[in-house]
Curated annotation (Swiss-Prot):
Natural source organism: Pestalotiopsis microspora
Record key words, sorted: Multifunctional enzyme, Phosphopantetheine, Phosphoprotein, Transferase
UniProt-recorded name of the protein: Non-reducing polyketide synthase 8
Keyword match Phosphoprotein: yes
Up-regulation conditions: The expression of the dibenzodioxocinones biosynthesis cluster is positively regulated by the transcription factor dibT.
Gene3D superfamilies per record: 3.30.70.3290, 3.40.47.10, ACP-like, Malonyl-Coenzyme A Acyl Carrier Protein, domain 2, Polyketide synthase dehydratase
Active site: C578, H714, H758, H1368, D1557
GO molecular function, one term: phosphopantetheine binding
């Protein structure tokens, strides 16, 4: 049907008025975000249903278009739930898809606004009945098409969605074509492709452009052109760099005003770039377009902007094609549109015209001006639509109910059920067999003999001894889930199994993260039901440790699933008692319906270990006392049997599941939850509420109750519950009224609890999985709950109502005329009711012949995280093939590669059929031990681009015929070639000629480069992107394109022009090229004096010569006689020889003006220069000219790349070309390569080559986007339900011991309290009268000649000692300062000397080499002793030295490992003073210099109060008597202080600690206050010093001056050293030498300096302690925020067996056993990675080294085997999380003195990394 609008030649009835709708190419509002918000809010109101539908469907259309994009583009688009989300993504709108995104936004805003206007004013939509016309600019023309095709607002909402699709596709095509002209730099701001030049006529602009073309030779595709013009301005478009060059070099344009337009997406209105193929690419034949074309045709005149004429279109498709062609290929001449509008107004004799616009703009003003000047009598009005949208909306406006709900597809499921059901198949087996799997409560839960009393009299006991239990619920593959054994053991097994079943369900669903929009990580949520915390309450509560909270609290179950899979959607743990899992699934459905998520993982979990719940439910009369699962509907039903269970399902909206090619196993049509508010009690069921719920769900889903053929009932086996539920079901699904079920529509009912008991929180998902299995098996399993007779309380007319209880298996086949629908009930003891209506899955779609996968060879992959699992996965796949010999290879390859996660142990094989595949997989099974784990680091990838002559003259490329990315790129490049005046090169690639047919040089060479550019694009789409490129001869053009140096257009231009010049200037065949298998030196020696030229040096023994044919022929004989093979290359010209001389100058000129050379984005290995090119100057026209003539030294290029580490032994080499040549050169030139693969081979199918190459790269560690590989063929592929992952399980289980759950008594602390009392009652004996505040009691002294030992003990809680500690507070805790340790040293040193040498007189003492490995922090409880022990000993007092050791003493009086050591040296005061004299003037000079700097305002002078205020704020809060510094001058890390010692007395001391601190803590002040240190993020503490010497006593009230300069050490920049000088009256009287400070993150302050009794019980005693002490469990405190966590050490050396389960009991860690034979992963120089057996650990590694001890400690803390700690193992994979890392870091610091930061395991992510660091710095 043609438009009814009149033309100038054919005039219908005149209309008195006319309407013109104008759609601009500019956004109609400056605040686009605000406008979109208003449209969104309006769409939620009842009066705008069409607007709501349009916005919703437009979003779905864009989502569908995104799904079709190649990954490189798809990955740039974030997840979205509305197209308006894009507005906020500025970078997206200016990126590669900017044109698509802005085009969509423009169309949606325009049409959305128009729909809103006409919904508000429905009578005004009379466009197709009156004199109306449409006009638009650019993309605005697309919006006119939607209006032209629509008879109503409802039609407009539909047609508008198709226009949104076109706008998106148009941007994609424009971006693709434009990027071939000039690629954009994603790291730089976007640049404009168009500029307006005002006040210039079109003729002036054309003349100047013609002159520019005459000066500059360039490809026609790159030319600047006029895209739009009017009477007073011109828009000039072109590649940005060309535009910039024009405006910079043209004298004419330099004098004009240039306004760059925000056109960032590419070029339109370019007839030289686009053709009808591009138009068809945009207006592709889709189902939605077919439907629209079948029911809509153009109804209104739409003016073309190039001619002003109307579009003559009969169908929607024709109209779209004409408009898209207008946008892509035609100039905008707005004046012609203005003239046509005036003509129509005149022809129709209208008296008034209304112009509808979104807002006024220049084109509108031009139109209005024309009306007023040329038709002054015409009454013209304008209506701006944007102002009709209110700025704000009334919150009270009624809101619509929203769009209709989608059905929800279940696409994956997994379970662990009682009775040994470890998967859904074994679960079905027990259902099908009618098994009742109840059993006596197993011993791994609790002792049934003590916790069960059938009479119910024993306190806290269970009345029942039965339950239904999962076998070995502790089985878990901890390393797979990156959990340490310690974390796994302390994590609730139901949460672990939820994680496992979630993985399996996702695996069966074919889930791969971000594969499609519906699998975007940001749009996936996790929903699980859980109603108990047994394991946390009982098992882990026996010894609370690090993972007590994250391993046991319910929220962490779904949270851990989200964390492991990196889902960023919501995670919910829901407790509605018995209905938890189905209520959770309903919540997940709601989330999907509301589009809060696009995919949901949901389910429930229950593992029973707490006897309290059994006791409570027994006393509440819930549980049966008899041995059965549940006697559902039995006359003697007396309650339910508790059960374990874990179930997980994966859900999507149905349309998304279909689009994602998922296996749909069931379809949820409706779901809802209500509450039995009218029940007689909260736990009593209510039939009315249940019936109401069922009716509500069926009504909302549009389901006739009689269409439901099965109801899976809650069926707990209670008298009240069974009666009420059966009544509610029969009332709704099988009523007794006049309308009854026919005999053809029986209603079967069942209850899974009769088989596996009542799983409580997991009951709902258990029932749902049963129904899903019934759909799969087309079978209803027997109901086994009736043990005696049918419950007489049930309706007596069940048979008459056609309600059937299946006592035996019943067939439930698909029917042709109706779908199988089931209902699943799940009720809560707390009163909640949930019901789900579920329909059978749709039948798999038939695969049309044209959709069959054309590939003949396929890559099948198998992977795992361990070799054990890899072997298991491989065996499972082989078994699957044995059982399914007819499986299609394409489906198998698709499922294993594109629809599975890939792990670090990989196998991949290429095969053409199943027998071949089985043979290859079996071979792999026999060599499983040789499979190496790939590194987490991606290997380097090098692209090598082939030169000419490697393939047939004519090719027939399967990639061109079948692969869209490759084909599209070839076609685009061919279009460029045609546009540049060259012949098409398609005949050289499409098989239209025999393979030996010789094409022209132009065709052949362009075809080669085009193939290589397209191959690179294809590899990139598969995720294989180079880190470095090298091109051989002609291949260098493609290499430079990939490196970003040349655009595709310029590469084609240069290659075509070079080939044209060869054809025109050079005689083909006069010269030849000859390959010689010899080195250049060999050839030079043999062919000395003979004429030849060296064309290529391809390898150490691979050279190509060029020259006259006759000259090279004479070389053959001597070379062959010398044993060197020679063969001529099949090329028409001798490249890189004198034959090319005639073309060089002209080619250089063409390259100079015709191509733009950019700086490479990748390193380029240059065969011309033998160098690596990084800069922007080397690659230019001169380079291209030289590369044509000079030698190709491929060998030098590759060797240079290796020297610069751009390629290494693990680099993956990919040959980009029609046949492998370069990769062989690379292998011969390098020591080793990781892998080398071709893209194509002669005489081999492209798909066979690609399958093998992808398999090789995959196994070598490359990340292949397998989905992109299979995506073009997905219509012909099916997802297979393959075997799930073969877990490498171990049993992680903490056994509940004893009967404390019965007694509720806790005797844990009794022994400790008794020991404390004993310690108080029996103090250590005093052996001496010596008593000071710090040395309170000598408990041991022994002297033997010149050897002697003195041991003292002191209680830190003694008043003076405690006051001294509290005088030095850190983190609010009293900390024993090092000056107290110094006083103890001086006291004991003096005592020892007097005892052993009474006549020694006044001897000075040096406290040397003090090292404090752990701070001594005062406990909070002052009523309990806190004992320390310090010993001083000397082997020979005559040496003048003695050794000191500090130890904590536990409550049993046993000393722990030393926490500090020092050496006491006796010396001569006078000698010290004399030795210090030379340094005095130096120190004085530095002090004076600081004074000068302070006077100049450079250094800071701080008062007494300010100094200690800063000190207290940053780290240490000193008591008054410690505050000796009166003023401080500080500059960077240098300072001096004036000190006055306090006269305040307090305690008995040898050298008061507040004296020592006052003169020495200037160093600590500098390290914690100086602006040279990041004191905000870090703090510094001293672990000791080299020496502390005072030649004169420190005197109360005396004045001193201290000076220090701290310097960072070279070895460790976090460690600082300095000397503190103490001066009195300008004389050095003391030095604290080599004082050391170490920097720590401030976040660890709480961890290091907390009172010990705030964290954990006493530390574990040493190995020499008593047996009683060894029995104490060891706990390590790890602070995380304000919480305290405890890590319990667990030994697995003395397990007890219960059944088949390994029960691990918490015990103390014993001394490690002697080292036995071990296997150490030492690399054999010949066989990489081969293990070497050594006799013992000591022979392989130094077990006493810090590194070895640290690795052992990590194994111990994480409960890992030493064998697990191989160098390549990453801490993340071993499960060392943030909590565990804090525990280990503290242990390393405490026990080994290794000071580490909290980021240790991030900085050194693998065992090998950490071991190397420890060996380097600690040994």
């Amino acid at each position: 049907m043609r438009p009814t609008t009149p033309s100038t030649t054919e005039s219908p009835d005149n209309f008195s008025n006319m309407k013109l709708l104008y759609f601009s190419n500019e956004f109609p509002h400056d605040d686009l975000a605000g406008l979109s918000r208003q449209l969104t809010l309006l769409s939620k109101q009842k009066q705008f249903p069409h607007l709501a539908r349009f916005l919703d469907h437009a979003t779905e259309a864009v989502r569908d278009e995104v799904r079709q994009l190649p990954w490189s583009l798809r990955n740039t688009i974030p997840s979205f739930d509305s197209v308006f989300n894009f507005i906020e993504h500025a970078s997206l709108r200016k990126g590669e898809l900017g044109a698509s995104i802005d085009g969509v936004l423009l169309v949606v805003v325009q049409l959305g606004t128009l729909i809103k206007y006409y919904e508000e004013n429905p009578k005004k939509y009379d466009l197709n009945t009156g004199n109306a016309a449409l006009s638009g600019l650019g993309l605005g023309l697309l919006s006119t098409a939607a209006v032209s095709l629509s008879s109503s607002v409802s039609d407009l909402a539909v047609a508008g969605v198709e226009v949104v699709r076109l706008a998106f596709r148009l941007g994609v095509v424009v971006g693709s074509v434009s990027s071939n002209l000039e690629s954009r730099d994603p790291t730089s701001p976007p640049v404009s492709w168009a500029a307006v030049v005002p006040d210039v006529t079109v003729d002036e602009a054309r003349d100047e452009l013609d002159a520019f073309y005459a000066r500059e030779k360039m490809p026609s595709t790159s030319k600047i052109f006029i895209s739009a013009w009017s009477h007073n301005s011109v828009t000039i478009s072109g590649p940005p760099s060309r535009l910039k060059h024009l405006f910079r070099t043209s004298e004419f344009f330099r004098g004009q005003k240039i306004i760059n337009l925000p056109v960032y997406g590419g070029l339109c209105h370019a007839a030289h770039l686009y053709n009808q193929e591009h138009v068809r690419e945009v207006v592709s034949e889709t189902d939605s377009l077919k439907e629209l074309s079948s029911r809509a045709s153009p109804k209104l005149t739409t003016f073309a902007t190039s001619t002003g004429k109307r579009f003559e279109a009969e169908t929607a498709r024709e109209l779209f094609e004409q408009i898209v062609a207008e946008i892509m290929t035609k100039e905008i001449r707005w004046g012609t549109v203005v003239d046509s509008v005036l003509a129509q107004a005149h022809t129709t004799s209208c008296s008034d015209i209304q112009v509808l616009v979104f807002r006024k703009s220049l084109p509108v003003y031009d139109l209005l001006t024309a009306f007023s000047s040329k038709q002054p009598g015409l009454e013209v009005s304008t209506l701006e639509l944007i102002p009709t949208i209110p700025a704000s909306l009334d919150n009270g406006t009624p809101v619509s109910g929203g769009s209709s709900k989608s059905s929800i597809a279940i696409v994956g499921m997994s379970c662990r059920m009682p009775g040994g059901a470890t998967d859904t198949e074994s679960f079905w087996n027990l259902l099908e067999k009618g098994m009742d799997v109840h059993r006596t409560i197993p011993a791994d839960r609790f002792d049934i003999d003590t916790h069960h009393d059938p009479k119910g009299k024993a306190m806290n006991s269970s009345h029942t001894a039965y339950g239904c239990f999962i076998d070995e619920p502790g089985l878990f593959d901890a390393p797979f889930f990156n959990m340490s054994p310690r974390e796994a053991q302390q994590t609730d097994p139901m949460q672990r199994l939820a994680l496992v079943t979630a993985y399996e369900a996702l695996e069966r669903a074919g889930y791969v993260a971000n594969r499609t929009p519906a699998t975007s990580l940001e749009r996936i949520g996790t929903f699980y039901g859980q109603a108990s915390d047994d394991y946390r309450e009982v098992n882990t509560a026996q010894e609370i440790s690090t993972y007590f909270i994250p391993g046991g609290c319910r929220a962490f179950g779904p949270g851990r699933i989200n964390y492991f899979f990196k889902f960023a959607g919501p995670s919910f743990s829901i407790d509605t008692a018995c209905s938890s899992s189905l209520a959770t699934i309903q919540t997940a459905c709601t989330s999907l319906w509301n589009k809060d998520t696009d995919m949901a993982v949901a389910g429930g979990m229950n593992v029973l270990t707490n006897s309290d719940a059994f006791a409570g439910l027994s006393h509440g009369h819930f549980l049966t006392k008899t041995p059965n699962a549940c006697k559902t509907w039995d006359s003697e039903a007396d309650g339910y049997c508790r059960a374990d269970g874990i179930g997980s399902i994966v859900m999507k909206r149905l349309e998304d599941a279909i689009a994602d090619n998922d296996n749909i196993i069931g379809v949820i049509r409706g779901a809802a939850t209500n509450h039995s508010a009218e029940a007689v009690s909260i736990t009593h069921p209510h039939a009315g509420a249940q019936s109401f719920l069922s009716s509500k769900v069926l009504s909302a889903a549009g389901i006739d109750p009689f269409d439901v053929s099965y109801v899976e009932m809650h069926g707990t086996g209670t008298q009240a519950g069974d009666k009420e539920e059966m009544k509610s079901v029969t009332d709704v699904f099988a009523p007794a009224g006049p309308k009854r079920r026919s005999m053809r529509q029986p209603l079967h009912v069942g209850a899974v609890k009769a088989n596996v008991g009542h799983g409580e929180a997991v009951a709902g998902v258990t029932a749902l999985i049963k129904v899903l299995l019934m759909f799969q098996k087309s079978m209803i399993p027997p109901h086994v709950g009736i043990k005696n007779s049918l419950n007489p309380a049930l309706p007596s007319d069940l048979a008459e109502r056609n309600v059937r209880i299946p006592y035996t298996r019943q067939a439930w086949p698909r029917e042709k005329d109706r779908k199988r629908i089931a209902a699943v009930n799940n009720f809560s003891a707390a009163g909640g009711n949930t019901m789900i209506a579920i329909e059978e899955p749709p039948l798999p779609r038939n695969i049309a012949p044209e959709d069959e996968d054309p590939r003949t060879t396929h890559a099948v992959t198998v992977s795992a995280k361990s070799k054990v699992s890899l072997e298991g996965n491989l065996k499972r796949l082989i078994a699957f093939l044995e059982n399914n010999p007819d499986v299609r290879m394409s489906d198998l390859a698709y499922t294993t590669a594109a629809r599975k996660y890939h792990h670090n142990h990989r196998i991949a094989v290429a095969a053409a059929d199943v027998p071949q595949l089985k043979k290859k997989l079996s071979a792999q099974l026999n060599s499983i031990d040789s499979v190496k784990s790939i590194s987490n680091l991606q290997p380097l990838i090098a692209f090598a681009f082939t030169g000419q002559g490697a393939s047939y003259k004519s090719m027939d490329l399967q990639l061109f015929h079948h692969e869209p990315t490759f084909r599209s790129q070839i076609l685009h490049l061919n279009s460029l070639a045609l546009a540049q005046g060259f012949p098409s090169f398609l005949p050289a690639v499409d098989g239209s000629f025999p393979k030996d047919h010789a094409h022209s040089a132009v065709v052949t060479q362009m075809a080669l480069v085009a193939i290589e550019i397209s191959l690179a694009a294809y590899w990139a789409s598969l995720g294989v992107v180079p880190n470095v490129v090298v091109g051989h001869s002609l291949g260098e053009y493609a290499a430079l394109y990939v490196a970003g140096v040349l655009s595709a257009s310029d590469a084609i231009y240069l290659v075509g022009q070079r080939a044209r010049l060869l054809e025109e200037r050079v005689q083909a065949g006069s010269h030849k090229m000859m390959a010689v298998r010899a080195s250049l030196a060999d050839i030079q020696k043999i062919a000395a004096g003979m004429p030849y030229e060296v064309a290529c040096i391809n390898g150490p023994r691979d050279t190509v010569l060029s020259g006259l044919s006759k000259d090279l022929d004479t070389l053959i004989e001597p070379l062959q006689k010398a044993g060197f093979k020679c063969y001529s290359l099949d090329v028409a010209y001798a490249f890189h020889s004198s034959q090319t001389d005639p073309i060089l100058e002209e080619f250089g000129e063409l390259a100079e003006t015709g191509a733009i050379f950019h700086a490479p984005k990748l390193p380029v290995l240059s065969p011309l220069l033998g160098k690596v090119i990084f800069d922007e100057k080397t690659l230019n026209a001169t380079y291209m000219k030289r590369a044509t003539r000079e030698c190709v030294n491929y060998l030098a290029a590759v060797e240079t790349g290796a020297k610069l580490s751009l390629v290494d032994d693990n680099t993956l080499w990919v040959e980009i070309g029609p046949h492998p040549v370069c990769i062989n050169m690379s292998k011969s030139s390098l020591r080793s390569v990781g892998a080398a693969v071709p893209s194509m081979r002669r005489d081999e199918s492209n798909w066979a080559t690609m399958a093998q190459s992808l398999s090789t790269l995959h196994c070598a560690g490359a990340t292949i986007r397998w989905n992109e590989f299979h995506k073009p063929f997905e219509k012909g592929l099916r997802l297979l339900d393959l075997p799930t992952y073969a877990w490498n399980n171990k049993n992680y289980w903490i056994q509940y011991n004893g009967d404390w759950a019965l007694t509720k008594g806790n005797t844990y602390y009794d022994a400790q309290k008794k020991a404390l009392e004993t310690a108080k009652a029996l103090p250590a004996p005093r052996l001496s009268d010596l008593k000071t505040s710090s040395v309170q009691r000598i408990i041991e002294e022994s002297f033997d000649g010149s050897a002697g030992t003195v041991v003292m003990q002191s209680d830190l809680m003694e008043a003076d000692f405690l006051a001294a500690a509290h005088g030095h507070k850190m983190n609010g805790c009293g900390v024993v300062t090092s000056s107290i340790h110094a006083d103890i040293s001086y006291t004991l040193g003096s005592y020892l000397l007097k005892k052993m040498s009474p006549s020694s007189g006044d001897i000075a003492m040096n406290v040397a080499d003090l090292e404090v490995v752990k701070g001594l922090v005062a406990q909070k409880n002052t009523k309990v002793p806190q004992m320390i022990q310090v010993s001083i000993s000397t082997e020979n007092i005559n040496t003048g030295t003695a050794q000191l050791r500090w130890q904590n003493v536990n409550a049993q009086g046993i000393p722990d490992e030393p926490f500090a050591t020092a050496t006491l040296e006796y010396g001569d005061r006078s000698a010290w003073l004399s030795s210090w004299v030379p340094q005095t003037h130096l120190i004085q000079g530095r002090i004076e210099a600081l004074e000068t700097l302070a006077a100049q305002g450079i250094a800071n002078r701080l008062s007494h109060n300010m100094a200690y205020l800063l000190f207290a704020n940053n780290l240490v809060d000193y008591a008054t008597k410690y505050r000796g510094m009166q003023s401080v001058v500080i500059n960077g890390l240098e300072a001096f202080a004036d000190v006055t010692l306090t006269t305040e007395k307090g305690g008995v001391w040898t050298v008061p600690p507040y004296f020592i601190d006052s003169v020495a803590h200037l160093a600590g002040f500098v390290m914690n206050v100086s602006d040279a240190i990041d004191t905000k993020a870090n703090y510094c503490v001293t672990p000791g010093w080299s020496s502390m010497r005072f030649a004169k006593p420190l005197v109360a009230g005396a004045k001193y001056r201290s000076y220090v300069k701290m310097i960072p050490t070279v070895e460790d920049r976090s460690v600082y050293l300095g000397d503190v000088y103490v001066l009195q009256d300008n004389e050095i009287i003391g030095i604290v030498g080599g004082i050391k400070f170490r920097q720590y993150p401030r976040i660890l302050l709480n961890r290091f300096f907390s009172a010990p009794d705030e964290a954990s019980p006493s530390p574990n005693p040493t190995h020499g302690a008593t047996a009683k002490a060894q029995a104490q469990p060891k706990t390590i405190a790890a602070s995380h925020g304000d919480e305290k966590h405890f890590a319990t050490s667990v030994q697995i050396s003395t397990p007890s067996k219960i059944g088949h389960q390994l029960i691990v009991k918490p015990v103390a860690i014993q001394a490690p056993p002697p080292a036995g034979p071990v296997v150490v992963a030492l690399k054999d120089p010949e066989v990489q990675g081969s293990p070497v057996v050594v006799a013992s650990a000591a022979a392989a590694v130094d077990t006493n080294s810090v590194a070895s001890k640290a690795i052992s400690m990590i194994a111990n803390e994480a409960a890992l085997e030493q064998a697990d700690l191989q160098d390549e193992a990453s801490f993340a994979e071993l499960g060392i999380d943030s909590l565990m890392s804090l525990v280990i870091s503290e242990k390393l610091r405490e026990e080994l003195g290794v000071v580490v930061s909290g980021s240790l395991f991030l900085e050194y992510p693998t065992i090998g990394d950490l071991r190397s660091w420890l060996m380097e710095y600690y040994g």
